Amino acid sequence: MSQQELLKKIIQALDQAEIPYMLTGSIVSSLQGEPRSTHDIDVLIAMQKTKAHILLEAFAPSEFYWDKESILEAVDRRGMFNLIDLKEGGKIDFWLLTDDPFDRSRFSRRYKEKLLGLEMQVSSPEDTILVKLRWAKLSGGSEKQFTDALRVYEVQRGKLDMEYLELWATTLAVAPLWRKLLNEAEIA
């Protein structure tokens, strides 16, 4: 199954199970910034334990690897679980929505984007930038994550809520990376 087919399958399964979601990560930064290849799909979901079986029904064990116990545990601890396409190796990382103020804020700011003939809920460009900066910091300065954030900023410049970005860059302790991004964008 191609990544596009996998993405369609995920969105249809989430919509059918009525699980609120938001696409995030490199697939969204490629949409909002500069396209780059990525092997996984990141999805933030607001799923209750009772919905897990409905979601899993869409992913046959003969085609996808998943562990029901790990999934239920991830729902309990508001962590993450993944599904792996056994044929193509595509990976879907499902991140459970937490009570973290930034998680709640970015989830409330998601918007609909038409892609592959489907309407999908995606992260706002501001939140994509902030998450990429946070991952850059957590990974010890990942240039790939920083560059993704920079490219989203460059493409979306003039349409971004700069006050929101400043507030959360400070709150998330990524203000130095945010300033570096602004400096590099000015030079370009």
Predicted segments with their positions:
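Compositionally biased terminal segments of proteins
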Residues: 1-188
